[in-house]
């Protein structure tokens, strides 16, 4: 992103680790530019509710976030990808325009058996939604729209209740921030745009189910280690595993 500042050794650190681990992509610890004691993001996960989770976002930096690990999805805020990955997996899906295109790409990678690494010693600082604003109408509309696209593209044949619960809970957050109209307009826009989406191959349905279930387990493990957010507490109550 153009609102990111990289540590001088960021690139060298990611290249060295990715080469050593044989990873297809790599990302580091991203701190908030305005308060370097808070995490902006680390790695991403996706729930059975078709809602993406940026692990660590808004949490205090702590030893938990200093643990390197294998990851499914790298936030494209600041990440490194092997060129051949785009040849094998495909380019970013331009239907998403902005927001969650990295989630879609990471999910495609994971379905294909590709993975990356989180390297906390590679540090970046991010302004965070500097273009639109974290809860601006445009941001909420874009995310609400793209949640529909993600579900239409990858969640065909998956259990319906987690999707309904996850989307409604996110909508409640939007209403709480006085962005209910933006949320609803985004959902309607998503339904229209989804008609042009390419659906996954039938054989991918089971793979998606496994990947998303494992990813959701990781979300709850992160929540247990760092403290539950209101959204995930409510989601866990509505959608027991």
Model-derived features with residue positions:
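A hydrophobic membrane-anchoring alpha-helix module
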Residues: 231-241
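The conserved acidic donor/metal-binding loop of glycosyltransferases
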Residues: 1-5, 95
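Active-site-adjacent helix/loop segment of glycosyltransferases
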Residues: 116-219, 228, 232
């Amino acid at each position: 992103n153009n609102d990111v500042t990289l540590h001088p050794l960021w690139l060298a650190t990611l290249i060295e680790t990715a080469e050593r681990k044989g990873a297809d992509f790599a990302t580091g610890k991203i701190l908030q530019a305005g308060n370097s004691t808070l995490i902006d993001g680390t790695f991403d996960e996706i729930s059975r509710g078709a809602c993406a989770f940026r692990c660590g976002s808004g949490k205090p930096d702590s030893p938990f976030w200093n643990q390197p690990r294998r990851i499914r999805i790298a936030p494209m805020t600041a990440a490194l990808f092997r060129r051949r990955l785009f040849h094998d997996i495909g380019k970013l899906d331009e239907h998403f325009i902005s927001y969650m295109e990295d989630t879609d790409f990471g999910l495609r990678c994971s379905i294909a058996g590709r993975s990356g690494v989180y390297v906390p010693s590679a540090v970046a600082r991010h302004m965070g939604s500097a273009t639109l604003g974290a809860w601006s109408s445009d941001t909420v509309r874009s995310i609400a729209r793209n949640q529909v696209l993600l579900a239409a593209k990858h969640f065909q044949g998956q259990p319906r209740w987690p999707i309904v619960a996850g989307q409604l809970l996110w909508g409640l957050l939007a209403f709480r921030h006085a962005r209910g109209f933006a949320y609803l307009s985004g959902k309607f826009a998503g339904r229209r745009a989804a008609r042009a989406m390419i659906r996954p191959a039938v054989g991918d349905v089971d793979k998606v189910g496994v990947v998303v279930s494992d990813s959701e387990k990781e979300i709850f493990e992160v929540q247990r280690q760092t403290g539950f957010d209101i959204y995930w507490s409510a989601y866990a109550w509505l959608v027991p595993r």
